[in-house]
Amino acid sequence: TRSRRPEPERSDRLRTEAAEAISRGAAERNPGRSPRALNRISLPDSPVRLPDADVLFRRALGDRAGGRALGRLGEAARAFEDERFQDARRILNQLVERTAEVPEVLELLGLVHYRMGHWRAGAKRLEAFRELTCSTEQHPVLADCYRAQRRWDDVEVLWVELRDASPSAP
């Protein structure tokens, strides 16, 4: 069997990759026209604490179907870890149709789209994750989606939010 990488290492690698891409994007930035930043809700001082995916699936679908949906989310996560992004996207698209209020589904689907280079779709799902959780956790990836679309104002807004949410912020 294939050994799994520890979760923090993979998460750090993805964040580092996104931060490097944004640094490259700063060099590409053209002072020409850029679409206006989206009108976003302001984030509270701390993220919203939501129930686990298992609870949300069971609330939305019932005990039996909720348990199956949780298993499918696990399958999608394994496909993502193995870089089988098409498989992960297929599973997650089925889940998001029925359970768009489960942040783990939105987050993973946004990351799948990001890794596939589907910037607009990735941004859509990660924005939904941001609104639902009030978290800045995926801001580097979301900002890179906007950088790829040359939406510089959105990139700037996200970096300001991330800076303001940082524990070392003044």
What are these regions (language model features)?
Residues V105, Q138-H139:
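TPR alpha-solenoid repeat register
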Residues G62-E97, L108, Y114:
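Alpha-helical segment of the N-proximal tetratricopeptide repeat
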Residues R58-A65, N93-A100, E127-C134, E161-A169:
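Solenoid-like repeat scaffolds
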Residues Q149-E156:
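Coil-to-helix interface segments in alpha-helical RNA-associated scaffolds
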Residues T1-A65, L70-G71:
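Basic Arg/Gly/Lys-rich low-complexity intrinsically disordered segments
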Residues F85-Q86, W119, W152:
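TPR-repeat structural position
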